[in-house]
Amino acid sequence: MKNAFKDALKAGRPQIGLWLGLANSYSAELLAGAGFDWLLIDGEHAPNNVQTVLTQLQAIASYPSQPVVRPSWNDPVQIKQLLDVGAQTLLIPMVQNADEARNAVAATRYPPAGIRGVGSALARASRWNRIPDYLHQANDAMCVLVQIETREAMSNLASILDVDGIDGVFIGPADLSADMGFAGNPQHPEVQAAIENAIVQIRAAGKAPGILMANEALAKRYLELGALFVAVGVDTTLLARGAEALAARFGAEKNLSGASGVY
């Protein structure tokens, strides 16, 4: 078993991604052919569940783009279900400290290394037990990315980075800026300083730093600092702004309500 995304991070190869929020396998397959290294299937803020994640994993499977799945919470039951339908790389939201990071890792590992329940006969991940020795290979194929999104998490970053099994740390600019008192303004100098310092610290610890940033100049800046997995856009935003721009070119009045945002 292999995890191409995990291997790329370990090799230090920057991976450029796109956020998927449409919760639809048809659009996921369309975007899987666009040339991004990875696609984030969002179960935290998009209307996804295990079934919709499954259909998107199936739609993406034949393309080079690697799927990353974000559950709605650091919940071992939800994590178990996502792994069973075939997710190998998870982005765990709102991890505040080392204990929560350890819990995330444990949820992705079969015993004795962790607490993942064994149900491989029912699981797409094992191809219904057609993958030889799946139970003994699966742990090494898991890629765990944790999100730090608050001042508390930032203050605990060093101990989070010490947790075995953490492959990368993702900085959440939207929640971080809100927690720092600058909601809706992740480009505030204080927020940017915190983000840049974290990227350098994460990379120095031998882990992969990641972030979502649709501002092209900032995304490139983060890559220069050492970020290794950077999402540079969101499907819903691309569709909404692209449709508005097309309509505007033919005389439609643009509805500006909500047109600007963090991403």
From Swiss-Prot:
Binds 1 divalent metal cation per subunit. Pathway: Aromatic compound metabolism; 4-hydroxyphenylacetate degradation; pyruvate and succinate semialdehyde from 4-hydroxyphenylacetate: step 7/7. Catalyzes the reversible retro-aldol cleavage of 4-hydroxy-2-ketoheptane-1,7-dioate (HKHD) to pyruvate and succinic semialdehyde. A divalent metal cation binds at residues 149, 175. This is 4-hydroxy-2-oxo-heptane-1,7-dioate aldolase. The record marks 70 as: Transition state stabilizer. Its cofactor is a divalent metal cation. Its EC number is 4.1.2.52. The keyword Kinase does not apply. GO terms for cellular component: cytoplasm. The keyword Metal-binding applies. It comes from Salmonella dublin (strain CT_02021853). Belongs to the HpcH/HpaI aldolase family. It catalyses: 4-hydroxy-2-oxoheptanedioate = succinate semialdehyde + pyruvate. Gene3D superfamilies: Phosphoenolpyruvate-binding domains.
